[in-house]
Amino acid sequence: MVMQERNSNEDNKVNHGIDNIYVLELDLDGSVLFASTNFSQITGISSLELTGKPAALLSSDQEIFNAAIEQLLDDDSHSVKIHTVISKLPSLEENVFVQDEEMELQSKSVELDCVGVLIRDPLTSRPSHTLWVLQPLKPTRITRQEIGQQLTETLGFGAQLLAQHLEKLQTVPSTDSLPPFETVLCRVCDHEIQNWYFEHHTELCLLIHHAEARAQEANDLLNEQRNALQSLLDSLDDQIEPDVSYLGVPLAAVLPSSITSSAKSNSRSSLSQKIRNYISNMLFDAISYTDSCLAIHLPFIPESTTREDNQPFSEIRLLSPASEVFNAKTLSWCLPHIDDPGLQLMFENTDALVKKKLDAINRLSNIIYYSERVRCEIEDQVQTIIEQSIQVDGYDEPLSTTTPTLIEPIQETLMTQSPIIECEPFNTVKPSVSPEEVHDISQFNHRNDPPITAASVDSSNSFSVHRSSTNHSSTNSGSPNLSRRNNLAIPIASRRKSVSAVNTLYGVGSSYTSESFPFSKLTVPVERNSFRETESPKPFLSRQIGISTLSSNISSGKGTPSIQDYEIIKPISKGTFGTVYLSRKNTTGEIYAIKVLRKVDMISKNQVANVKAERAVLMAQEESAFVAKLYYAFQSRDYLYLVMEFMNGGDCASLLKSLYTIPESWAKIYIAEVALGLEHLHRLGIIHRDIKPDNILMSITGHLKLADFGLSQLGLTTRQLRLQKGKNNILSPPSFQSPTALGDPGDNIASSPLILPTSVSAFSYDEKSQKQKTELATFTTYKEDDTTTTTRTSIDSISSKYLESPVDSQKVNRTPNLQSVPFFRQPDAPKRFVGTPDYLAPETLRGSTQDDMVDWWALGCVLFEFLFGYPPFHAETPEKVFENILANNIAWPDLEMYPCSEEALDLINGFLQPNPERRLGFSDINEIKEHPFFNGINWDDIFSHEAPFIPAPETPLDTAYFDSRGAGAAESNMSSSVNSGEEVSKDNNVSQERGSQFLRSSHGRSRERSTSARRSRRFSEANSEFDEFGPFSYKNLSVLERANRNAIEKIRSEIAGKLHISPPDPHIGYTPGSDMPSAKLYDQQLTLSPSLMTNQGSNFSSTDSTPRKSINSSDVESRSKTDGPKSMHDLIKQLHMRKHSSHTNQSTGSSESDDLFNLDLPISNLETSYPFKIEEGQASPLSSPLSKTPPFFSSSVPLKALICVSKLNLFSELIKLLKSYKFQVSIVTDEDKMLRTLMADEKFSIIFLQLDLTRVSGVSILKIVRSSNCANRNTPAIALTPTRIDINAAIPRMFDGRLYLPINAFLLRGYIARLCNK
């Protein structure tokens, strides 16, 4: 396992919206044990530096945290809430401006609302530490006396909604007709949440899901380590001498004395056997250790469960009994004392990964416990307020009447509806495990999929929900700012201790009608004998008014994606390994493209590594503007599901098929956009390796995105390897991290789900005993007529006919090469090259290192095909294609028939250089950008200009641009699969036997290497239901969080009494769930008739009836004279006239993702948003941004805009837009003058400030302005970021918005309307 820091490119990726929520752990003395990374935004000190320091140094009231801890120690049955002010010292860069003696920099203070709970040690039940969640104090306009000051501050604007609901209750004649609360769908967990609690729920929900993502990542890392150890164990069977290494360090180089003492007396074969057994035993120990940890599943609370009403809150179980046993077993494991460096490194890395997962689960457990406790206390307070309000209004119905109540049993359908999540019933017989054996996460429930991202915490900081059985009376000593959450401004008539909290926690009341639970669609038939009749108090009124809608616990299985959450509309396209379906999400009506892959096909065709790589790449680019987005990933027993953007513009192969060739002016823009996308990928260490027209998709705006990362390689590029060679003996790949999985301080193992140092490419064994291979190249995985074929032979011996052979027919044990092995490389896979034959680089065919230069070669092939209509090395057979590539025999057409500029020819020749070191782009991307072919291209704002061709689908569901490729035959199969619950129910039965299988397989040990290998494989099979693919689960939290934030803003606007729609961030299109109809994009194009642009793969197929890539001269001439377009108008007309054309050619893609088509934005509420209408003041992004002044803007005063940037030419488009909106624009490029201008007496209407200035950041400049009393202290400020690399950087709270290149006119207009029209 290679330890390394995060890649610098990832440091700026902070998830939107969660930056104002801080997590803090304090020991009982008030010292900091842990602080979330974003806490440094308040303190100015990094989280690592903050660890160990007293919390008293942070707060203006030095005793407030200690007083709160004392109250928690006295009685931890409730949380404690405090208000404090934390001051931030000026950073070093701000001191640059402290040159004028008259100017003093003021410190930034933040008033925080802090809520803490006590955490107890699971072994001793003694207090261990406290957990705090801090957030800025929410200002409220109205404080309702009937609600109470403290609850008003906690709920923010939700308190006004609650007060409005209380007013409604006063008009209700009886308790039988109490109105339910209005609810809002949480996009993160898919629960309907009451509107007054929605904002608070969003914060807690995001905390839980980000912690869950970290736990998932940690599990992925551990699972890859286990696979690497298993491969090492298997390799012992294939060697005469046990010569195995881990991360380049030989294993068993230093033998124990028991083996060395008998070395002389034993024969060589006997000694080798002893060494082999010794290594095998060590590997088996490490594998057993990882299996124990992998068997521990994510903690979560089920939707409903059978419980007693008097069950204490502390007895909530978040782990299954089996997971508790595995947890105790894992914690009891000790590192063996070994002198051998290789084995010691192996055990240390394994132990670090195990602890990383345990710590991640531990922290997730703490957050779940905290969230549920806080939620229950808030609900308890609201419950009491409502009951008192009804009693005061004179209801005669008693609230404490004793009546028979039926306790509903576990709803198994709710707990098994997802193919990923399984809830183990609480009535399962518990194993005989003593409290000493059940360690820190002993109170968690069971989840089917292995937990999964990473947090760093010392494992001694255990979590437990045990607390003292004695409930002390509440005291309120200490600081006057300290207050109990259960102390309301009005007295609570019936403090139900933790009973009502547990009632709501377990969903008691779920048997009520759908009016109380409008979000619940799943019901379970109730058998009379399954109920238990008891005498209990009458249910609280909250159950009658729907308050327990709030009780939907955040981490339940309902929040996990499942195919049953979607309506399958129709198939879009069918490929070799699966089918893409147009689908609508049931809860929101949004449109997605779901890629469905059959597991059996993926395994038999050796595509497991490819689909893993594709998911990993997409996860790392949640909001990339260059890559089609992945929203969800999940699996069932038989299928994998990738929920993607639906890009109804088709792909470039469709465009080529309709036009035959693409005009050079169009090709210039398209190639430039693809080049920017490749630059983005290469900076992240990602090599696409399958660039071709089929994998270049077109959005609704006509701009391009890359797709199909099934053949991608993730790791160091050759240039990165050259830079690192000589510095370290072991080369480590760059670290990646999904913005969803925000890391914590101390993540020193690996912070990424992408690059796993413990994959098989990280270890090697000696190849001396292996048979030397003499082939020039090995060929594998081509698709022809939906058939995967594989051959391994030399280029000279390839037969004239393309041969087929089983995928796994030849398996070679070899030394994996870190420089050329693709991510998730299977240890027994044959050495191979990957890609589509027509676009393969010569170094790929020769079997040499494949680095990022192969993508530039492929881009040259794409440019050639754009201009001439066929690939440059096209031939009748794949063998001849390979020969042409190696000989650099480019099939140039007659340039008189296909006129082309000298610059285009030079660019093609530059890309198609056989020597990678002479190929264009070898030095850097600037070689390409500065080429004369791209003269006139503004690389900084290319995406802001109108595309050459803009698709015009007739409806949001229009798939006329796609070739179904026989997908219609799969529609019935998919429908039956989705509608049948058989597969899901079967999935949930698998893990019922895991615990017993694991325990049975762990007894005893075989000393024979083959037996050990077989047993370790059985370990894996018993431990993971989805062993081949691992925990295939993912949510794009960045997009879902933004949807929640938009909903919150909408509620706020409604409360304020005026309509205010916050413009969405342009880099993700319109946010899912946004009320702004995304279908407005189609409005101005409805008069155009879309062309039917069917897809044809760009791969070679000898059976094509009308091959697009033929270079027959007569065909070229005929096409040029009859079908060739003569002008841009003719091109567009030609596209429109092809709407009803039919192409029957079958495509032959090179990877399973050829059929992936995506859209720039999910489209919601299609039935109500179509036909489309653009409201006044909501101009379509497709309209000209300079056409008119924003009609929604009105101001009687002159508008002044100040632009502070270092390079004026980068933001020329912004200046044009502002001037078109009648602004007086002032521009400052000198950084010192920026501060003086802002501090002067002239007041501006709006400020645009660049963040990444040369000497000091724009954040620091604005800090000084905000802390002063100058005229622009409160002037709205927009942050400017020159590149899309900063796309995931959070907006500093002092800014009012953010713009990045290319400037989005629609977003700018929204900012102007919101900030300058007051």
UniProtKB/Swiss-Prot annotation:
Catalytic residues as annotated in Swiss-Prot or TrEMBL: 690
Primary localisation category: cytoplasm
GO molecular function: ATP binding; protein serine kinase activity; protein serine/threonine kinase activity
GO cellular component: cytoplasm; cytosol; nucleus
Record domain Protein kinase: where: 566-934
Residue numbers spanned by region Disordered: 431-485, 968-1022, 1058-1078, 1091-1127
Top-rank taxon, per record: Eukaryota
Residue ranges of domain Response regulatory in the record: 1200-1316
EC number: 2.7.11.1
Keyword Membrane: no
UniProt-listed GO biological process terms: intracellular signal transduction; positive regulation of G2/M transition of mitotic cell cycle involved in cellular response to nitrogen starvation; positive regulation of induction of conjugation with cellular fusion; regulation of mitotic cytokinesis, division site positioning
Biased segments, Polar residues type: 972-1000, 1091-1115
Catalytic activity: L-seryl-[protein] + ATP = O-phospho-L-seryl-[protein] + ADP + H(+); L-threonyl-[protein] + ATP = O-phospho-L-threonyl-[protein] + ADP + H(+)
Enzyme class name: transferase
Places the protein is found: Cytoplasm
Comp. bias intervals (Low complexity): 462-479
Protein known as: Serine/threonine-protein kinase ppk18
Originating species: Schizosaccharomyces pombe (strain 972 / ATCC 24843) (Fission yeast)
Gene: ppk18
